[in-house]
Amino acid sequence: MAIYGIGTDLAQVSRIAAVLERTGGRFAEKVLGPDELRVFHARRARSEARGIAFLATRFSAKEAFSKAIGLGMHWPMTWRALQTLNRPSGEPYVIASGELAAWLDARGITARVTVSDERDYAVTFVVAEAPDDVAAARSGAAS
């Protein structure tokens, strides 16, 4: 396996909060997958700030992932097709669905993700890995 791509994103929590307020909550429904949306609602019910921070980290994760795979937010990369969830240990991981999952599987691409947030910002770092020949083809190196 080799590095296929690296992506990072920094989201301003207050900006995410403003968009959420302006859209009456529709922003969360547009961006979050079903499992993420359940966690968002549960966290927001306990603490508005923690709910918004969760939304900011997940928005940031999708942006960083889209950069790591080199597509940006273009088909098959869609907001709801990628979810960042947490293992019982707290470790974040990504799970793709639909056409994005098929696209990743066809290329043997996997990813590692880390997310962090403070009061003002959420940051994500993603490393996408693929078989050596796939990663080399993307980088333009001779196979």
Swiss-Prot record:
<dbReference type="InterPro" id="IPR004568">
    <property type="entry name" value="Ppantetheine-prot_Trfase_dom"/>
</dbReference>
<dbReference type="GO" id="GO:0000287">
    <property type="term" value="F:magnesium ion binding"/>
</dbReference>
<keyword id="KW-0808">Transferase</keyword>
<keyword id="KW-0275">Fatty acid biosynthesis</keyword>
<keyword id="KW-0460">Magnesium</keyword>
<dbReference type="GO" id="GO:0008897">
    <property type="term" value="F:holo-[acyl-carrier-protein] synthase activity"/>
</dbReference>
<keyword id="KW-0479">Metal-binding</keyword>
<feature type="binding site">
    <location>
        <position position="9"/>
    </location>
    <ligand>
        <name>Mg(2+)</name>
    </ligand>
</feature>
<dbReference type="InterPro" id="IPR002582">
    <property type="entry name" value="ACPS"/>
</dbReference>
<dbReference type="Pfam" id="PF01648">
    <property type="entry name" value="ACPS"/>
</dbReference>
<dbReference type="InterPro" id="IPR037143">
    <property type="entry name" value="4-PPantetheinyl_Trfase_dom_sf"/>
</dbReference>
<protein>
    <recommendedName>
        <fullName>Holo-[acyl-carrier-protein] synthase</fullName>
        <ecNumber>2.7.8.7</ecNumber>
    </recommendedName>
</protein>
<dbReference type="GO" id="GO:0006633">
    <property type="term" value="P:fatty acid biosynthetic process"/>
</dbReference>
<keyword id="KW-0963">Cytoplasm</keyword>
<keyword id="KW-0276">Fatty acid metabolism</keyword>
<keyword id="KW-0443">Lipid metabolism</keyword>
<keyword id="KW-0444">Lipid biosynthesis</keyword>
<dbReference type="GO" id="GO:0005737">
    <property type="term" value="C:cytoplasm"/>
</dbReference>
<feature type="binding site">
    <location>
        <position position="63"/>
    </location>
    <ligand>
        <name>Mg(2+)</name>
    </ligand>
</feature>
<comment type="function">
    <text>Transfers the 4'-phosphopantetheine moiety from coenzyme A to a Ser of acyl-carrier-protein.</text>
</comment>
<comment type="similarity">
    <text>Belongs to the P-Pant transferase superfamily. AcpS family.</text>
</comment>
<dbReference type="InterPro" id="IPR008278">
    <property type="entry name" value="4-PPantetheinyl_Trfase_dom"/>
</dbReference>
